[in-house]
């Protein structure tokens, strides 16, 4: 067995694209080797990446494919042999199979007798396969954006390819791509090592060889190095700690090859600015880590990750340069904050008429009006359900929510939209409920983010997003495939998350009603089915990927209705709790069998399954087993319905499971599809009656046996 190393050296790759590309390259190489039967049992795949390279190391690679014996079938025997002598057809087939005519065999098939031959297919060498296949795998790697860099050449890639390494053991495989031929030579850190080539003696020495050339190719090792350096440098400031920011750690990990960390400072006067502004400037614009004191308050320091290992003299120069840049950014922020206060948010509302939301949907002023109407309807629904809402604060927050788009601070630091509005609202004397709702309006931006902490903030977020979704669908801008230019999936994810985690008494139907009735877009309700399917798809995603419910549990509860998000999740929780019990598993299997019987009967009759009657004639139940099932179901149905009405779904499901003896006996003793039409129809009606009576919590036929 051998090890295989493949590296692509590039000009600097955008940091946000590296992780996915590293994973895809490793997957493609491993799948290629697996597909070609070149991987031994116990093989391992290791991925590497830096801003200038993607690499994969595979152990347990066979030198060649095993020879394979193939059974080939040729022409009919009567055509291949005449009077016992081979014809040209037999000779041609023997030549194709690579055997002598005498080795041909008679093969009997259902279609008759044919000529057959056993042929040994010689396994190809691994280096031959890799040389041929790797260029296609490289070209197939997905990048959000590609570029051409060789005039008149067809290759596209994220950045120009500078070098490649392809080693099978110590053997170089001269793979060619984009005018570059692979060798056993890579390059170290651009500054710390220079342009001198670095020879890789063997695949297993890849990481160590690069380490000596001041490149840490292993991403996790680099991430650990950065975190360790952050801890170490922060300890030089008494009582300080760096503010945890995993996303920023990840970003700088993909921006560096040999990272180190430098501490800088800024004037304490800037701490008068809101912390959110300071942290955004440091994190989003400069890739600096914030430093806080023991109480968790921002300290006048920052940490920056460098892609070098500077001397003390160089570090002082770099520190001074970073401090100067940050000081300028903070001065800008302070200036914008001061200038913006001269016009209140309330006086900025009319300015939204000149800020376009979408060319077909009008300005943000119109958007605000639509959101307000939706919010009024949602507020009424919540109050009707017995929950108190500060409607005045909600509507004031809606009115002012988008006004910060006209501020200089948001124009310069767009990441702060919403947050700036909330801060300005508080500074200008708006109520705390108003300020909080505005501040949190864009949360959650991802499934990891919290929902707004106040009911008013939750309703503002819902009204804003559902209005956008409905109107975008109405003008034909729904997401397609991987394209979602208006982030409607993110908006729908937020709708589901707010409804679920806020436990809001608002159904998806009523949510869409509010948006459709409030929209000024013609035929806003025309896309209702599409929008509802879209929201249910996001609910399915949330339940499976965020809450972690099994796919069959999710399918089962969604099939029974998904208009109430909170209720749907409660049913999934109850179903998850009982699905493993023996009685419930048997009931689920019986329901699956029942559904199959009804489907087959409906197909045979040429009608829809739902149209089959559930009206049972008790006088046409001659078998004791079917009588017992009918009586038990009729007695149990109101009990289950009462528990369901109380939302006691677990107890309801446990009651349904008590029907197992009667269900088992029915299928053991009763033939449903009998010749007698009346009897058959009545038994089908009994099955339909049982299914309809006990499927309002979940469609148990969706449950898969563990």
Curated annotation (Swiss-Prot):
Keyword ATP-binding: yes
Superkingdom field: Bacteria
Gene Ontology molecular function: arginine-tRNA ligase activity; ATP binding; glycine-tRNA ligase activity
Disulfide bond residue pairs: none
Swiss-Prot/TrEMBL GO biological process terms: arginyl-tRNA aminoacylation; glycyl-tRNA aminoacylation
One annotated Gene Ontology cellular component of this protein: cytosol
EC number in record: 6.1.1.14
EC category name: ligase
Presence of keyword ATP-binding: yes
Keyword terms: Aminoacyl-tRNA synthetase, ATP-binding, Cytoplasm, Ligase, Nucleotide-binding, Protein biosynthesis
Localization of this protein: Cytoplasm
InterPro entries attached to this UniProt entry: DALR_anticod-bd, Gly-tRNA-synth_bsu, Gly-tRNA-synth_heterodimer
Catalytic activity entry: tRNA(Gly) + glycine + ATP = glycyl-tRNA(Gly) + AMP + diphosphate
Subunit architecture: Tetramer of two alpha and two beta subunits.
Family: Belongs to the class-II aminoacyl-tRNA synthetase family.
Name of the protein: Glycine--tRNA ligase beta subunit
Organism for this UniProt entry: Acidobacterium capsulatum (strain ATCC 51196 / DSM 11244 / BCRC 80197 / JCM 7670 / NBRC 15755 / NCIMB 13165 / 161)
Phylogenetic placement of the source organism: Bacteria, Pseudomonadati, Acidobacteriota, Terriglobia, Terriglobales
